[in-house]
């Protein structure tokens, strides 16, 4: 593939295009001001909003909706805190109304999370599939958070999900891409965008996900809990751009043996024998 500076490289989800391949979370920041500056520094164009936490004015979420310029950033309501498919479907509907209140009348996106496991926060594959099927029927653009299960990813694609979002490692763990082999299988077989979600701790791991062929990453804790969230957000921004460019450029094939970068003919010793 030959790239030029004018080569378009938009990420399309549903009917919406994005330039940035970094999706950011809005939780865990030390203040709304730091969140605002971090989002600006990241260059992101879509952020997740935990519908239940906004509704209940949970710590760090009071004033969240008013703090973001929704004319520039697309809202991705999520169903965090839902343990069953029924709960997730109900909260997704509330999320659609929340997006409308923010001025995004045509926003039907939902990040689907069905998590009954309170210790490791691992998603329920059965509840996720059940909720996804119903929400797709209702016209939602469903972005499901899942374990790195290639079969489940394909099934969710088949029922009409707009993306699949396999976890790199447990939410907030900072363990990186522990499921890289399975994520690669998902990427290889997917016909919808693959967004690596959860577990990314440092920019190099975000770059790795894009180098593998992931279409985007979602990062929250690694930015919000950094010593300097604003600078970390910028670091993630450049790492993701670098990873994407590397993927599009095509990496050097791996070899079992060395391959010299200098010519092996016409060397000095050879010239002296003549």
Swiss-Prot record:
Catalytic site: 111
Subcellular location: Cytoplasm
EC number: 2.8.1.10
Family: Belongs to the ThiG family.
GO molecular function: thiazole synthase activity
Species this chain originates from: Prochlorococcus marinus (strain MIT 9313)
Family annotation (SUPFAM superfamilies): ThiG-like
InterPro entries in the record: Aldolase_TIM, Thiazole_synthase_ThiG, ThiG
Assembly and interaction partners: Homotetramer. Forms heterodimers with either ThiH or ThiS.
Name the record gives this protein: Thiazole synthase
Pathway: Cofactor biosynthesis; thiamine diphosphate biosynthesis
Keyword terms: Cytoplasm, Schiff base, Thiamine biosynthesis, Transferase
Catalytic activity: [ThiS sulfur-carrier protein]-C-terminal-Gly-aminoethanethioate + 2-iminoacetate + 1-deoxy-D-xylulose 5-phosphate = [ThiS sulfur-carrier protein]-C-terminal Gly-Gly + 2-[(2R,5Z)-2-carboxy-4-methylthiazol-5(2H)-ylidene]ethyl phosphate + 2 H2O + H(+)
